[in-house]
C-alpha cells in the first residue's frame, strides 16, 4: 500500500515527531457549511446522506476542499448500530434522533441481533471504501463508533435525554440487564470498527458523548470497562498499517489516568480540562486531542488566533497533540472562522516541533 502523503495526524497519535501540530474538527462535515446544507436538502433527509456512499463521500470531502485539514472523518452517525439492530431510527425535522422501539426488558436485549458490518451496515463500509479511494492517500481517514454506554442511553431512553432517568433506573434496579446490553454493544462495536479498518480506515475513534453524566464508580463499571474491551479487540496492526485508537469521553477529565490505562493511543479532552495538566498526568502514555471550546469560533479572527496560540503554549513543545475542538462544531459558525482556526494551528505550531 502506498504511503499516506500527509500522515502528520497518525504520527501525532503515536507520539512520533511531526513538523507542525495536526488539526481536524469534530463534525467538520456538517451544517455550518452551505454546500452541506444544499446537499442535505437535495438528499431529502440526514439518513439518506449517511446511507448513500457517494453522498457520504461528498460530504466527507467538503471541508477538505475549503481547509487544510490533516485528516478526514467518515460522515456517518453513532446510531447506525442500534438502527441496524432493528430499533427504527428516525430524525425528524429540527429534532434529534428517535427510536421506534426501546430496550426495557431482558427479552428486548435477547432479541437484539449482532448486525453484520458487510450486511445491514454495508452502506457504512461502502462509504469507507469510496472515501478512501477518493482521498487518494492524501490524508488519513478516521473511522468511528459511539461507545456502548452512549449507544445504550439512546436505546433505553428512545432518543436524546437531559436527565437519563430511564437508563439510570435500569443501572440501579437491573444492573445485570444493562450489563447484558452493554456486552452485546461492545461486541458489535468491536466488529464494526474492525470492518471499517478492513475497508480502509486509517485510525478509529470511540465517542463516549454521555460518559460524563456518570459517577466515578459507575463510569468505570458501565462505560470504561466496555471501551477497554473494544480497544483490546481492535486490529491495531492491519495489512501492514498501524491503526491508532482514540477514546473521547465528554466531561471525562477526571478519569484521564483510567482512560489511558485502557490501552488506547490517544484521549480526546474537552475544554473544561486544562491541557497542560492533562499532559503532565498522562502525556507519557498517550497523545491528547483537543481542546478548544467550539464557542470560541463565535469570536473574531483575533480571538480565535489568540486562543489557538494559548492552547499550543499550554501543551508545549514536542509531539503527541492533535489540535481539535473540545466537542463538535455548531451549525451557527461562519466557515471563515474555521479557516482562521486551521491556518493558525499550522502557522503557530511549527516552533513547538523544532528539535
Swiss-Prot record:
Q: Where in the cell is it found?
A: Cytoplasm
Report the EC code(s) recorded for this entry: 4.1.1.37
InterPro entries listed in its UniProt record: UROD/MetE-like_sf, Uroporphyrinogen_deCO2ase_HemE, Uroporphyrinogen_deCOase
Q: Name one GO molecular function term.
A: uroporphyrinogen decarboxylase activity
Q: Does Lyase appear among the keywords? A: yes
Q: What do the Gene Ontology cellular component annotations say?
A: cytosol
Q: What is the predominant subcellular site recorded for this chain?
A: cytoplasm
Instruction: Name the Pfam families for this protein.
Output: URO-D (PF01208)
Q: Which domain of life is it from?
A: Bacteria
Keyword terms = Cytoplasm, Decarboxylase, Lyase, Porphyrin biosynthesis
**Which SUPFAM superfamilies does the UniProt record give?**
UROD/MetE-like
Where do the annotations place substrate binding?
Answer: 27-31, 77, 154, 209, 327
Q: Where is this site: Transition state stabilizer?
A: 77
Named in its record, the pathway it takes part in is: Porphyrin-containing compound metabolism; protoporphyrin-IX biosynthesis; coproporphyrinogen-III from 5-aminolevulinate: step 4/4
* Reactions listed under catalytic activity: uroporphyrinogen III + 4 H(+) = coproporphyrinogen III + 4 CO2
Q: Which GO terms describe its biological process?
A: protoporphyrinogen IX biosynthetic process from glutamate
Q: What does this protein do?
A: Catalyzes the decarboxylation of four acetate groups of uroporphyrinogen-III to yield coproporphyrinogen-III.
Q: Which family does it belong to?
A: Belongs to the uroporphyrinogen decarboxylase family.
Quaternary structure and partners = Homodimer.
Please give the name of this protein.
Answer: Uroporphyrinogen decarboxylase
**Organism, per UniProt?**
Tolumonas auensis (strain DSM 9187 / NBRC 110442 / TA 4)
Name of the encoding gene: hemE
